[in-house]
Amino acid sequence: MYFLKFFAVSVFLIINSNNVFSAGSSSDSNNAKTKSSAYLSAEKLINKKQYSDAIVKLNDALVTDSKNADIYNYLGFSHRKLGKMEDAAFFYSKALEINPKHKGALEYQGEMFLTLNQIGKAEENLKKLDKICFLGCSEFDKLKKSIMDKKSGKKSSY
């Protein structure tokens, strides 16, 4: 399975090498704008596990960038970490509405599904990540581990 993915990607890269090397950096976001100071502040707060304060900054960031899937993903993450699953579900859905292939939102939404004991839905997100991440990605690996942990009775660390 991995060989086929590797082969397909290799052929694609060879055929489109001029386009690939001029494409620039990749991001989960569909937004090429520079990240706002409010967004950057929110990231720092999230890293410090100050989720309520991060939500305030993320809402500030939405004022000027309401179509940024990364902002909605972090809003979902912050609400999930605060135990506000309905709010988290809304924000993950919004992130995926903007960018259906947002790896972070698919992973974190999958983690939320596991918290809600909806293993089947988490596995659906894992399948989506498997299709998006041709040669694998950390989001796939983390969600897969969390699903395995959930099935064996362990608590996820994500």
Regions found by a protein language model. Give the residues of each.
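Terminal, low-structured helical/coil segments at or just beyond the last alpha-helical repeat
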Residues: 24-35, 123-158
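Alpha-helical segment of the N-proximal tetratricopeptide repeat
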Residues: 33-64
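Structural marker of alpha-solenoid helical repeat scaffolds
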Residues: 64, 98, 131-135
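Residue-level recognition of tetratricopeptide repeat
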Residues: 68, 102, 136-137
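Canonical tetratricopeptide repeat
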Residues: 74, 108, 142-146
